[in-house]
A protein has these predicted regions:
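Conserved alpha-helical substructure of the radical SAM core
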Residues: 2-83, 87-105
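A short small-residue
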Residues: 46, 139-141, 171
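Canonical radical SAM enzyme core domain
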Residues: 50-64, 86-129, 133, 137-156, ...
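Intrinsically disordered, low-complexity coil segments
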Residues: 67-76, 202-203, 251-255
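Conserved hydrophobic residues forming the short capping helix/wall of the S-adenosyl-L-methionine
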Residues: 69, 124, 194, 198
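Generic structural signal for hydrophobic
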Residues: 69, 99, 126, 161-164
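Conserved C-terminal portion of the radical SAM core fold
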Residues: 75-80, 106-107, 130-137, 155-221
């Protein structure tokens, strides 16, 4: 017998661990660096103003992976930027432009605060049908949002949202299901927030208001076996790593790495090499996030 999530190939009760096979990389995620203007409680990637564990990705590093995908016809449709706070990376606008110029749907995750607002002119010039800005908001009430994100984090976020709306950007919201409130209730309460702030968001849309299952590596969650797909009536293709990868630049490394999952940037088991081609290998679901967030939670970062 093993402890849970210890053996790559077998679960604690000695059953074959579920795995994912990848054929196309529909979504390429780029972590622009872990530095952030906020230090949110429970940040899965531990971003804050001092954490540079993932260094800033340069434009040339980004470009090499995009070109690899294009040249090898890997089926990429969307490019996503996450952090940290992407707008703190000086090359972010060059990266967004290159993504759009090559015809990719482009998604930027942001807190919509000063790093974005201080660069409004640069962002405005890139406004495009294929560009979507996803703004993180941890609650529809200021008090609870600031419990997670810290004091004075609400008003700048609202300012950023209203600027995006006024300037006709494609934008959406992302929130966490962490308040002992079911998703239906959360969406109903967000309708009031959206109406009060005159935003162009449909709270019933799972695309315009994205809800994420809460992640806690220490909480107990079942391991996923090869038998679970049939039991749960789920398909491997529904799991994020079946069609996506994330590129990160670890501070101690000379070259960026390709990671299986946006949620596991520091776990060496999910580091798949330095090229997209190398990364096309089986991904064994050997982490609590694989179970709770992706398979049972049905969440996806894209």
């Amino acid at each position: 017998m093993y402890s849970k999530f210890q053996n790559k190939f077998l679960t604690a009760d000695n059953k074959k661990r579920a795995f994912i096979e990848t054929e196309k990389l529909k979504t390429l995620w780029f972590n622009t660096g872990t530095l952030c203007n906020l230090a949110c409680k429970g940040c899965y990637i531990e971003s804050n103003p001092k954490n540079d564990r993932l260094a800033y990705l340069s434009f040339n590093e980004f470009k090499s992976f995009v070109n690899e995908s294009i040249q090898n016809e890997m089926g990429t449709e969307k490019i996503g930027f996450t952090g940290g706070e992407p707008f703190m990376n000086k090359d972010i606008f060059k990266m967004i432009k290159y993504s759009l110029d090559n015809g990719f749907k482009t998604l930027v995750l942001t807190n919509a605060m000063k790093p974005m607002l201080n660069n409004k002119n640069d962002l405005f010039r890139l406004n495009h049908l294929n560009l979507t800005i996803r703004v993180s908001i941890d609650h529809y009430l200021k008090e609870k949002h600031e419990q997670i994100r810290g004091p004075n984090s609400w008003a700048p976020m609202i300012e950023g949202l209203k600027w995006l709306s006024k300037n006709n950007f494609n934008y959406c919201l992302a929130t966490r299901l962490m308040w002992n409130e079911d998703e239906t209730t959360t969406r109903e309460n967000f309708k009031t927030f959206i109406r009060d702030n005159e935003l162009k968001i449909n709270a019933d849309s799972k695309i315009q208001l994205v809800t994420f299952a809460e992640m806690d590596e220490k909480s107990d969650t079942p391991e996923i076996t090869t038998e679970c797909w049939k039991i749960l009536n789920k398909n491997q293709s529904e799991v994020m790593c079946s069609s996506s990868r994330m590129i990160v630049k670890k501070k101690e490394n000379d070259y960026p790495s390709v990671i299986a999952c946006t949620l596991l940037p520091y776990n060496s088991e999910f580091d798949l090499g330095n090229t997209l081609k190398e990364s096309l290998k089986k991904i064994y679901l050997n982490h609590p996030h694989c179970s709770k967030f992706c398979v049972l939670g049905g969440s996806s970062c894209g």
